[in-house]
Amino acid sequence: MLMKVSQFFLATVKETPADAVLASHQLMIRAGMLRKLASGLYTWLPLGLRVLQKVADVVREEMNRAGALELLMPIVQPASLWQESGRWEAYGAELLRIMDRHQNGFCFGPTHEEVITDIARQELKSYKQLPLNFYQIQTKFRDEIRPRFGVMRSREFLMKDAYSFDLDEKGMQAAYEKMFDAYRRIFTRLGLNFRAVLADTGAIGGDYSHEFQVLADVGEDTVVYSDESDYAANIEKAAAQAPQGERVKPVAEMKKIATPGVRTIKQLADKANILPEKGVKTLIVKGDESSLIALILRGDHELNDVKAQHLPGVAFPLQFADEKEIREAIGCGPGSLGPVNLPIPFIVDRDAAQLVDFSCGANEDDFHWINVNWERDVPLGSVADIRKVVEGDISPDGKGRLRFARGIEVGQVFQLGDKYSRKMNATVVDELGKSRYLQMGCYGIGVSRTVAAAIEQNHDERGIIWPMPMAPFFIALVPVNMHKSYRVREACEKLYNELIDAGYEVLWDDRKERPGVMFADMDLIGIPHRLVISESGLDRGIVEYKARKSKEAENVSLENVLSVFR
């Protein structure tokens, strides 16, 4: 493809936008990749679109290699499908709902499980048509409450979403593994430093999921990993090793103490001279059918909201009871709660269940119990893992300690099972003539977010440093004083054509600009290789070559320039 800057729309700017916090957002605006239209809405300019298409091409190649079939579904979806699946209300305010002129309800698709399941139930009748995997690369819309960080968290974005259909769970798991491997190939080919981590299934649903996290200090997600094994999980899903051994026998007698004004674990620890990890805290959440449930944790631990909302009987999404509801149900404020004589059901975190001689609220304002013991003083009841892990916990596989890193989620894969096929009655007949619900998987990649994540991993003070597969151009050809020198123009023309004929994507900066301006722009937009032709270089038969990653330039023979790239 022939491309000179005079024929291209190079929209670089020096100023950093006031609302751009992340380096990726700043550089995408300054490099002329994006322009903001409204909150969370961006126009991709020609330079940015070239990068976006490079990422989409890699995704498409690997999806095709894995046997997936490309299709394209409507962005606008009928409300009736989402009502069938139960997500019309459950999805929340991020689902942009609209009405047409006939007062029919629709939404802008944030994802396409309902649409693809509708296609499957109409088109798939027999097990002989399986397995199948469909994918699309298409614009999505989610009405984010606070769009920020450019295309890292925008309302409109480009996404690859795929959906597999199998007869049974074994087939679904095989499809999942195939997509998992395809995702590894995609992000490896794109040159990204990433981790595949266990993840919560969120609003999509299903029983099993992995996220693909690009490691970056500015990432919104916390990636938890073992320093001695392959274990890795999003902090929402991460677990520590279960407590080992039996609870020791009680030592002291339970005693009620007055604690006027004490409302927190820290205040109780100071008042009673106990360690926070020797106390429990009690949180009240809403259960199914307007009931209340207490969640009990060790005093120094924090509740993992995602784990909690998946507990049997707990409302999804998680909702905390307010003080009025707590007082009506229990008779005291939130700072005086505890499991002893608690009139509502409770679930105990497995670490709290190991405590001996612990302290807790007495369910009476300004009073607490000390030296409380499970079974002796209060039945233990249900036990579950509901706490957030902390750095230094033992890995759940018993190998190493848990460490934390920041990550940007760029992809996620799900085993859905029959979550959608059962609700929408998508079935096929098996080899015995029996009707079976389709077993589904779904697999998403944020194509536009991947571009931003790559910049977060690959930039310096001068601009973007593109991984080779994502670069908008492979080589920047920069002449010095070309408009004053016929020799320089002629040498540029010759080399430009040689590079194009050899299959390289070249951007020839043929502007009437000072060399420093051209060098700065080429560094800003991140082209991996730069060639500089000048009168002095031609006198010596050389071209100046500089890799974007390198601080130093080197001279190469004009006759052997192509050998640099082989």
Curated annotation (Swiss-Prot):
The keyword RNA-binding does not apply. The keyword Aminoacyl-tRNA synthetase applies. It catalyses: tRNA(Pro) + L-proline + ATP = L-prolyl-tRNA(Pro) + AMP + diphosphate. Its main location: cytoplasm. GO terms for biological process: prolyl-tRNA aminoacylation. It is found in: Cytoplasm. Keywords: Aminoacyl-tRNA synthetase, ATP-binding, Cytoplasm, Ligase, Nucleotide-binding, Protein biosynthesis. Its EC number is 6.1.1.15. One of its GO terms (molecular function) is ATP binding. One of its GO terms (cellular component) is cytosol. Catalyzes the attachment of proline to tRNA(Pro) in a two-step reaction: proline is first activated by ATP to form Pro-AMP and then transferred to the acceptor end of tRNA(Pro). As ProRS can inadvertently accommodate and process non-cognate amino acids such as alanine and cysteine, to avoid such errors it has two additional distinct editing activities against alanine. One activity is designated as 'pretransfer' editing and involves the tRNA(Pro)-independent hydrolysis of activated Ala-AMP. Homodimer. Consists of three domains: the N-terminal catalytic domain, the editing domain and the C-terminal anticodon-binding domain. Belongs to the class-II aminoacyl-tRNA synthetase family. ProS type 1 subfamily. This is Proline--tRNA ligase. The lineage of its organism: Bacteria, Pseudomonadati, Pseudomonadota, Gammaproteobacteria, Legionellales.
